[in-house]
Structures are given as structure tokens and as C-alpha cells.
Amino acid sequence: STELRQTGKPHFLANLALALISAAIAGALFLLVLLLIEGWRLSPIGAAIVVSVMPLAALLGSRLDRLVPSARARAAAGAILVSGGLGGLALLPRAEVALTVPPQVMIGIGLALVLSALTETALSGRAPQAIHGGWTISARHAGVVIGILAVTPIFTHDIAQQRHDAINAGTAVVLDSNVPPLLKLDLAQKIESRLDDEKGKVPTIGPAFEPLPTDPEEHDQVVQLHEELQDQLNRGATHAFSPSFGLAALIGLLSLIPIGLARRVEL
């Protein structure tokens, strides 16, 4: 068995890596839930079902760690997988739930590998274990706070900018549509009212198109216009999250520095 040595000094590099990777993971969960609910307008239950892919993948990853005895290799592989998954979320081409599944699988497996390896390293050969376990928990909690604080200002700025760009693009869609002029004017006023009511958010424009015209031709034109506008808004919302996901991926990659610098054979 491993001989424990009485020391109050925590494993600085392992805990630093834990903080950085926890910041990246917090960014992943926080941003993905916001994207699904506020951007793509999924229900909270629907969003919860979608993000459940991540913990399920983590269960798979917990089985894979037995195949890699080196804690350093597991930590590095896990950090790369987490960052790669975040990079995939940053590059989502459109609002489609299925496209979030592969990046989530990468993040979940990476999470299991890196957290187990770094926690094992931070505690290895140290006593009392309760004290050093507390250091690992503190590092992870600090990372969560840092991650959310890091991505929130970028996300807030970008969602406002993308909202503005999507509105401009949507205006062009309305003007170019085949909807009769009077109906087009009425829709424009309703859409503007919806935008004013939901400043600072990705707007929900569905109510602006109700009630739908009874004339079959106008009905089809309005439905098509609604779909085109919603597509513009969804695309804008998706792109608004890209820089924040990218920052979270970069934070995850930074954890490779303390992992690589650690001199202990266990890492």
C-alpha cells in the first residue's frame, strides 16, 4: 500500500489543473443549458434530457480509466477530450439538438478521466486525507465560479450583438417575402412589439404570427415567413454562444500546462 506522509502542503499543480478543468466543465454545462432553453427554446425538461448525455458518457468514461494505468495520461487525455467537445459546441453549424450529442459524449468521457486522475494525484501519498480532499473540493468549486465568471460577460455581449444582427437579417426576410403589403406591415408591427418586450433576450416571435390568415395562399406565405425568421434567430443564437464555448475550450486546454509540469510519477 502507498505510504502516507503527514503534510499540510497540497499538490499545487494537480489542484490548479482541477480548478482549470472544472472551470471548463462549468462553462460547458452552464452555456449548453442556456443555449437549449434561451436560444433554441427547448423546455427545461427537454433541455435536461439533452444534457443527460454528458453524465451518461461520464459513466462510460469511469470504466475506461481502468484501461489506462498512468494518471498523467488519463488526465491529459481527459483534458483534451473535454476541450475538444467544447470546441465542437463552439462550431455548431445550426440549431439541431442531435449535433450536441458527439461533443457531449467527448466532454463526459473526458470529465471522468481527468477528474479521477487529478483527484487521485492530489491525494496520493498525503495525509491527513480529509484535509487534502478538502483542497480538491475547494479547487473544483473555485474553478466552477471562475468558469461562470469568465464566460458570462462574453456571452452577454455576444447574445446582444447576434440578436441585433439577426433582427437586421430578419427585416430583410420580411421585406423580401411574398406576403401582401398590408399583412406584411401588420406582421412587422407585431414583430417589433415582441422585440421590444424581450429586449436582451433571444425573442420568441411565434405569437406575432397569430392568428394565421384564413386564406390558404396567405396562410402558407406567413408560415414560410415565420420559419425563415425563426431560422435566422436560431442561427444567431447558436453563433452567439460560439465565443464563450471557445473560451471554455481554451481554459480546458490550459489545464494541460500544470498536468505537463507535474513531476510526480503518479501524474
Identify the residue ranges that each predicted region occupies.
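Aromatic-rich transmembrane-lumenal/periplasmic boundary elements in polytopic membrane proteins
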Residues: 155-208
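Transmembrane-helix exit segments and adjacent C-terminal regions of multi-pass membrane proteins
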Residues: 186-267
